[in-house]
Amino acid sequence: MNRKYKSLWPVIMFVVLSGLQLIGLPAFAQGPGPGQRIPLPPIPIKGDTTHTLSKHFTPASAATKTPDAKGFIQRWLVLEPVKKEIDRNNIFTDNYLRTTFSNDNFSGDYTTVPKNGETVKVGNQELKWYALDSKAFNFNLYHFTYALNKPKYGILVWLVTVINCPEEIQNVRIAAGCNSGSMWWLNGQEALLLSGDRDMIADNGTSARLTLKKGKNIIRGAVINGPGMANFCVRFLDEKGTPVKNLSISYE
């Protein structure tokens, strides 16, 4: 008999403990007692709902603009985004970018400089140019599209700026970073292609050696992104990797 009871003892303990847990559940399910405050859900942080360009940009003026302390170019003509159906960023191969930038182009003349406020047509989309100075070293296209209440994801954005050099500067390189893919031209010639799903890292890619001619030099850029925050930064580096700053920037 003792052996029989000993073999049943674990079963009896399991039943007793299970019963105690069931009895205690209602107590745990009850609300706070008298004098206790009902916990409130966390208050979400209020986002930026202003949709204004002035938060991150200033309108470009006729005043002389030079690169920032680290040589980054902050003045750009920026076209409203071309809406694209892009579900993922790993499709940005060299061939994809070249084909897309060729098909969804506002002009086949890569030395043309649009006018501030001008509207152009890309496919069936009518889009406007804005001449802006970024308040940061980079130009955040998410902030730009958000401010205009335009699509923020699945976009292609065209860019143009004019670099004025007091003298010819040889053996410089375009250094750019972008999210996610981009292509850059100097005076009508392809200079740099950044393919793949990239994060915006300064100097993430550099061109071959280039020459900035005396006078006007035209940079054109195209940045494309699917999910995530579109963004870019550009500067010139000399042979020693030092930022080139003896130039000025305009939008005409």
Residue ranges and their predicted role:
Residues 186-234:
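Beta-strand-rich ligand-recognition modules
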Residues 170-185, 219:
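Aromatic-lined ligand-binding clefts that engage carbohydrates, nucleic acids, or primary amines
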Residues 153-164:
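Short beta-strands within extracellular/lumenal beta-sheet-rich domains
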Residues 23-31:
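Signal peptide processing junction and immediate N-terminal pro/mature segment
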